[in-house]
């Protein structure tokens, strides 16, 4: 599936950038193949515009924010770095330095504005009117949990590949054999699956290695422990993984696999824990999950990002019983496309000659 060729994905909120990244001025991002610029407006809220000035098409992300007097600052309106045309969050040009102060600016002088909001420490963007809300993360406002912003990085793969991998119990003994995978137990545990309108809920218990260096992470000292995994999928590209150890420690990971284009995605990952810094240092948790994440990244970047979604296309990819969560993801994506009059677009179609080479 080529995500940029599926219009319905433009109607969902996507986690685009940590708000801390916008503290010092505008930042560019490519979402579903569309170049946008994000900045913090005069009210302290994130805004997103098409990354093109309507004057001579310079990228607005080359500019800076200005206050109502036109003075450079960290927040406010965004000023083009080429000729100084200045835009508010609606995309309207509100100031042209070359004009006399009382000269009216044509309402046609504008660029495209996108839906943008702040939630859970991120700027979220929908390129068109959203048809669903941002998935809830109740732990973000729960005093019983601490929030750790773990990863914000580009991967050379697609959201579909990352999503399916997130629910795949059969790769642990191989991809993660150096971290938590039990090499002697390659047969995966079975998920109990319950579908819902936004995706599905999947629950299982797995074995995990627990060397001394991981004791603070798990809260137990057994060489082999268990992970009670409560996993949830949210259309189109988000998931929640709630890991509970026998100690009662909860290790909750939220992922948004944000589509950059047809060959790249942005990994956005939050971690929530119901212990304290004294129990287990945040850096230890980041280091542990980073090692696991690097193992996933290495193998996923070797796959074809144009993942098969419509399983009626025979002879492209083959599946086994433990792939059921991935097949359910495909089912929900296909139902979503059908509700909006779409079919899967892929590279094999004559009308979709789209390269997937790495970006320069």
Which positions does each model-derived feature cover?
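A boundary/linker detector
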Residues: 1-10
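Rieske [2Fe-2S] iron-sulfur-binding domain
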Residues: 2, 17-147, 357-360
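Short Pro/Gly-enriched beta-strand edge/turn motifs at strand-loop
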Residues: 9-19, 92-100, 171-175, 236-240
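Sequence-level motif detector for i,i+2 pairs with an aromatic at +2
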Residues: 10-13, 24, 111, 120, ...
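Short, acidic/polar N-cap/turn motifs at the starts of alpha helices
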Residues: 13, 24-28, 35-36, 113, ...
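C-terminal catalytic domain of Rieske-type non-heme iron oxygenases
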Residues: 45, 57, 131-360
